[in-house]
Amino acid sequence: MATPAQRLHLLPLLLLLCGECAQVCGCNETGMLERLPRCGKAFAEMMQKVDVWKWCNLSEFIVYYESFTNCTEMETNIVGCYWPNPLAQSFITGIHRQFFSNCTVDRTHWEDPPDEVLIPLIAVPVLLTVAMAGLVVWRSKRTDRLL
C-alpha cells in the first residue's frame, strides 16, 4: 500500500489527466446548464443579506458577486467548458436581469459652453495653426534665397 508521501507524488499526474480529459472530451453543455443554477442560488442567498435598495450599489455586494463569478468559472471548467462562453454569459445575464434590472445609470447631460467661451476656444487654435503654417512657408522661402 502506498504511503501518503507516495500518493502526493501521484497528485500532479492525476490533476494533469483530469484536466486533459475535460479538454479532450469537450464541453459538456448539458452538465454546465445543470451546474450553473447552483451558483445562481448561492448568489441569491447571499444577496438576501443586502437590503434591496442597496442592490444597485456595487460596493455593498462586490464580495458576493466575486464569489458568484468564481463559482460560474469553476463550474464551467469542471465540465470541460471555457469561461466565459455564450451559455455561461446568458446565465449571468439572466442573474443580472433578476437582481439589477431596476438599476439605471444617471447619464450626465452635457451642454456646450456659452458662446463667449466657445468662440475663443475654437478661434485661437485655428488662428495659431494658420500662423504657424504661414511662418513655416515664409521661413522656407527665405532659406531658399540664402542658399
Curated annotation (Swiss-Prot):
<comment type="subunit">
    <text>Heterodimer of CALCRL and RAMP3; interaction induces allosteric modulation of CALCRL function and ligand specificity for adrenomedullin/ADM and intermedin/ADM2. Heterodimer of CALCR and RAMP3; interaction form the receptor complex AMYR3 for amylin/IAPP. Interacts with GPER1.</text>
</comment>
<dbReference type="GO" id="GO:1903143">
    <property type="term" value="C:adrenomedullin receptor complex"/>
</dbReference>
<dbReference type="GO" id="GO:0006816">
    <property type="term" value="P:calcium ion transport"/>
</dbReference>
<dbReference type="GO" id="GO:0001605">
    <property type="term" value="F:adrenomedullin receptor activity"/>
</dbReference>
<dbReference type="GO" id="GO:0050850">
    <property type="term" value="P:positive regulation of calcium-mediated signaling"/>
</dbReference>
<dbReference type="GO" id="GO:0086103">
    <property type="term" value="P:G protein-coupled receptor signaling pathway involved in heart process"/>
</dbReference>
<feature type="disulfide bond">
    <location>
        <begin position="56"/>
        <end position="103"/>
    </location>
</feature>
<dbReference type="GO" id="GO:0043235">
    <property type="term" value="C:receptor complex"/>
</dbReference>
<dbReference type="GO" id="GO:0010628">
    <property type="term" value="P:positive regulation of gene expression"/>
</dbReference>
<keyword id="KW-0812">Transmembrane</keyword>
<dbReference type="GO" id="GO:0001664">
    <property type="term" value="F:G protein-coupled receptor binding"/>
</dbReference>
<dbReference type="GO" id="GO:0032870">
    <property type="term" value="P:cellular response to hormone stimulus"/>
</dbReference>
<dbReference type="GO" id="GO:0031623">
    <property type="term" value="P:receptor internalization"/>
</dbReference>
<dbReference type="GO" id="GO:0015031">
    <property type="term" value="P:protein transport"/>
</dbReference>
<dbReference type="GO" id="GO:1903078">
    <property type="term" value="P:positive regulation of protein localization to plasma membrane"/>
</dbReference>
<dbReference type="GO" id="GO:0005886">
    <property type="term" value="C:plasma membrane"/>
</dbReference>
<dbReference type="GO" id="GO:1990410">
    <property type="term" value="P:adrenomedullin receptor signaling pathway"/>
</dbReference>
<feature type="disulfide bond">
    <location>
        <begin position="39"/>
        <end position="71"/>
    </location>
</feature>
<dbReference type="GO" id="GO:0051897">
    <property type="term" value="P:positive regulation of phosphatidylinositol 3-kinase/protein kinase B signal transduction"/>
</dbReference>
<feature type="glycosylation site" description="N-linked (GlcNAc...) asparagine">
    <location>
        <position position="57"/>
    </location>
</feature>
<keyword id="KW-1133">Transmembrane helix</keyword>
<comment type="similarity">
    <text>Belongs to the RAMP family.</text>
</comment>
<dbReference type="GO" id="GO:1904645">
    <property type="term" value="P:response to amyloid-beta"/>
</dbReference>
<dbReference type="GO" id="GO:0006886">
    <property type="term" value="P:intracellular protein transport"/>
</dbReference>
<feature type="transmembrane region" description="Helical">
    <location>
        <begin position="113"/>
        <end position="137"/>
    </location>
</feature>
<dbReference type="GO" id="GO:0009986">
    <property type="term" value="C:cell surface"/>
</dbReference>
<feature type="glycosylation site" description="N-linked (GlcNAc...) asparagine">
    <location>
        <position position="28"/>
    </location>
</feature>
<feature type="site" description="Required for CALCRL interaction">
    <location>
        <position position="140"/>
    </location>
</feature>
<dbReference type="GO" id="GO:0008277">
    <property type="term" value="P:regulation of G protein-coupled receptor signaling pathway"/>
</dbReference>
<dbReference type="GO" id="GO:0097647">
    <property type="term" value="P:amylin receptor signaling pathway"/>
</dbReference>
<feature type="topological domain" description="Cytoplasmic">
    <location>
        <begin position="138"/>
        <end position="147"/>
    </location>
</feature>
<feature type="glycosylation site" description="N-linked (GlcNAc...) asparagine">
    <location>
        <position position="102"/>
    </location>
</feature>
<comment type="function">
    <text>Accessory protein that interacts with and modulates the function of G-protein coupled receptors including calcitonin gene-related peptide type 1 receptor (CALCRL), calcitonin receptor (CALCR) and G-protein coupled estrogen receptor 1 (GPER1). Required for the transport of CALCRL and GPER1 receptors to the plasma membrane. Plays a role in cardioprotection by reducing cardiac hypertrophy and perivascular fibrosis in a GPER1-dependent manner. Together with CALCRL, form a receptor complex for adrenomedullin/ADM and intermedin/ADM2. Together with CALCR, act as a receptor complex for amylin/IAPP.</text>
</comment>
<dbReference type="GO" id="GO:0150061">
    <property type="term" value="P:amylin receptor 3 signaling pathway"/>
</dbReference>
<feature type="signal peptide">
    <location>
        <begin position="1"/>
        <end position="22"/>
    </location>
</feature>
<dbReference type="GO" id="GO:0005764">
    <property type="term" value="C:lysosome"/>
</dbReference>
<keyword id="KW-0325">Glycoprotein</keyword>
<dbReference type="GO" id="GO:0015026">
    <property type="term" value="F:coreceptor activity"/>
</dbReference>
<keyword id="KW-0675">Receptor</keyword>
<dbReference type="InterPro" id="IPR038126">
    <property type="entry name" value="RAMP_sf"/>
</dbReference>
<dbReference type="GO" id="GO:0007189">
    <property type="term" value="P:adenylate cyclase-activating G protein-coupled receptor signaling pathway"/>
</dbReference>
<protein>
    <recommendedName>
        <fullName>Receptor activity-modifying protein 3</fullName>
    </recommendedName>
</protein>
